Structure formats: structure tokens, C-alpha cells
Regions:
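N-terminal hydrophobic targeting/anchoring segments and the immediately downstream early-domain regions
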Residues: 1-132
Length: 132
């Protein structure tokens, strides 16, 4: 399921490691769950990308290209993975709609999800041009 280690303190087996993953933000669902259990109810999940940096690190052989450096291809992939994480969290909690993590698309949905005690996740996009 995961392409990197998720253990943090005290081992730090995989992160932080800027040389290996300078363009990759990690977000393990258990870390979000811990924040939700502590009372966090609203999160903005930015699909953040920068094709210039991606092209530079690939061109200088700092990192191999795993996916396209095209901004919108990367944004679509990040959004798809956010929905996949929602489905995964639901599956861990009994099925569709049962997890703490809910992607919302309207203020009304956010209020409903927060009122139900779940975490409302707003999708955003930020690219090298400063946003879309």
C-alpha cells in the first residue's frame, strides 16, 4: 500500500530525507487520524506541484521521474490519491462513509461532516503559477 516507511520517532527510518524525496510530501493516514482524535475537523488538502522544480531535479538526475512533471497530470493524480485515501480509511472502519476522513465540495457538506464529528477535507490546487 505505501511506498515508504511510516515510522517516525524514535526510529526515523525513512523521513525526513530531503535528498531522497525533495518533491514528495508524505501524509500517513494515522497522523491525520491522530489530529482528528485531538479535535481537528477541517483540513485543506492542496494538490501542490511545480513542473519547473520537477524538470530540474529530473534533468540534474537528483531523482528519477516516477510520474509526469506536467502540473495538471500531477494535480489530477494527487486528487485521485486523496479520494483513494478516503476509500481506504472507510474500508478500515467498516465501509463507505464510516471513516473519519470526508472529502467535501461545498460549505454545506463541510458543515454536515463537521457536525457529524468527522474531518472535512477541502481540495485545493497550487501550482508554480501561484494557484488555479
Amino acid at each position: 500500500m505505501f511506498n515508504h516507511e511510516t515510522a517516525g520517532y524514535p526510529d526515523f527510518t525513512e523521513w525526513p530525507n530531503a535528498r531522497k524525496s525533495s518533491t514528495h510530501q508524505t501524509q500517513y493516514y494515522r497522523w491525520l487520524e491522530r489530529a482528528w482524535m485531538g479535535g481537528l475537523r477541517l483540513v485543506v488538502q492542496h494538490a501542490t506541484t511545480n513542473s519547473i522544480i520537477c524538470d530540474m531535479v529530473v534533468g540534474n538526475a537528483v531523482q528519477a521521474t516516477r510520474y509526469s512533471c506536467n502540473d495538471m497530470v500531477a494535480v489530477d493524480r494527487i486528487i485521485d490519491e486523496t479520494y483513494a485515501m478516503e476509500r481506504y480509511i472507510d474500508a478500515q472502519n467498516g465501509g463507505p462513509g464510516t471513516g473519519f476522513f470526508r472529502v467535501v465540495t461545498t460549505p454545506e457538506q463541510a458543515r454536515e461532516v463537521i457536525g457529524a464529528g468527522q474531518m472535512a477535507v477541502i481540495l485545493g490546487i497550487e501550482d508554480r503559477r501561484g494557484g488555479i
